[in-house]
Amino acid sequence: MSVSDKDFKDIELLPVKSIESKDSIDQCDPLTWPIRIRIINTIIISFMTMLCMYGSSVFMPSIPELCEKFGEPETLVVLGATLYVIGVMLGPLIFSPLSELYGRRPLNIFGYTLFALMQIPTALSVNLAMFVVFRFFSGFFGSVGLGIGAGSLSDMFSKRDRGKYIGIYFLGICLGPAIAPIASGFIAGSSISWRWEFWILLMLSGVSLLAGVVFLKETYAPVLKRKQAKKLLEKQENQKSVEVKISEITESSQQIDPDKSFAEVVHILVTTIRRPLHLLCTQPIMILISLIVGTVYGILYLLFTAFAEVWISQYHFTSGLSGLTYISLSIGQVFAVFVLLPLNQKYWLSAVQKNNGVPEPEFRLPMAFLGCFAIMTGMFIFGWTVQYKVFWFVPLIGTTLVGAGFVMTFNPMNMFIVDNYGRYAASAMAAIAIPRNIFGACFPLFAEKLFERLGYGWGSSLLAFLLVAINFSIAALYMFGKTIREKRPFDHTKY
């Protein structure tokens, strides 16, 4: 069952002598925290998540060197990226629901510690098998930010303010895979070993982990309220009365309690971990959003895989210069976050006002429609200008549009999920991560064959035509989403 504020209202009515003050109650509600604390939490979570996504494409420019080092073909070396993305897909299935039992902070610190440690054996890999195995575990543990991040931000910000701060978080998701090849491209084109790509990632993740240990706070209200209730139990004179309230809180929030039997604990854990799969398999809204987000994500990763080869073969760039071309994607993403998403927030506020102050998740979606169109346009420009070797600056205009369009599509879709599923946003985000990362893992596998057989022009056009169907899906979600949600609501009492 879900936990509402009314589950705790009786606690405030108990005779309190020493700890019931307005300040102590506010500590249980992250929405009331000082904005400085919430922004610090947002920055740390966003940076951790960015580094996880940074890791997904960090070795792309060094693929030729790895092929030579391990004596394996490119199709097998690319498994280092594929298995990483699969790890990123599976991690949120565990971390997200567990964060709704144990809280966000301990899982963030645990997962990110292991993510940092996984860079050591990856950098020391002596063969391809060792490399891809530790790449998988690196993605699995690093995905904790992807699974919990959106939920943490929804804990701290109201629907009115949520858009701009979650926009910063999603900027980290988008920038990570785009900026990694920039640094790695120069490493690949120099005498420095490819291993330094992972040593640098270890250093960066160590810094962010230290910041998390020092500054990151717990944001999940049921966990905070449970801790507050335990303080009451310790300090109140009327022990029996308070114990009753503690029991009610534990039962209603499904928190793991030391007094529960092992079988009860296992039941709660299994039920909670099943929640993302239940959402994905039974919610039509989730299925539709999964297809939309997965397709866009897959196209972006396909582009990451093809980028280095395009600039080297068609324009004879060095590895370092080809890495710099990823900046165009980053420029588009930054522009979308700081210019276009605020416009979408203004539209959302206007739509809420016209709807008598009632916010609907569908109000987030118009920007996604425009974003998908921007990706389509960018793919056409990129593909055909590269095909005919037009001046290199022109295809970069196309990739800038792709970068902006990705944020414009990805952010509203995830905001829709956060708005619709509220306290269970972390589980819903974990559900979306499954198809999203399957697409992200599979699309790069056929990138080489796609452009080899169709050429860059028609290959990119095929992907753009696929996005036409995606745009129709976004339009359908906007028009009929509310009806679908009302007919098939999520019954959180079962999960």
Swiss-Prot record:
Entry keywords, A to Z = Membrane, Transmembrane, Transmembrane helix, Transport
Q: Which Gene3D superfamilies match?
A: MFS general substrate transporter like domains
Q: Does the keyword Transmembrane apply?
A: yes
Q: Which residues cross the membrane?
A: 43-63, 75-95, 106-126, 128-148, 168-188, 196-216, 284-304, 323-343, 366-386, 390-410, 426-446, 461-481
According to its record, what are the GO cellular component terms?
cytoplasm; prospore membrane
GO terms in the biological process aspect are: copper ion import across prospore membrane; transmembrane transport
Domain of life of the native organism:
Eukaryota
Q: Which InterPro entries match?
A: MFS, MFS_dom, MFS_trans_sf
* Topology within the bilayer: Multi-pass membrane protein
What does the UniProt entry report for the null mutant? Lead to sensitivity to camptothecin and DNA damaging agents.
User: Principal localization?
Assistant: membrane
Provide the GO MF annotations for this entry.
copper ion transmembrane transporter activity; transmembrane transporter activity
Protein's cellular compartments: Membrane
What's this protein's family per the entry? Belongs to the major facilitator superfamily. CAR1 family.
Protein name from the UniProt record: Uncharacterized transporter mfc1
Instruction: Provide the species name.
Output: Schizosaccharomyces pombe (strain 972 / ATCC 24843)
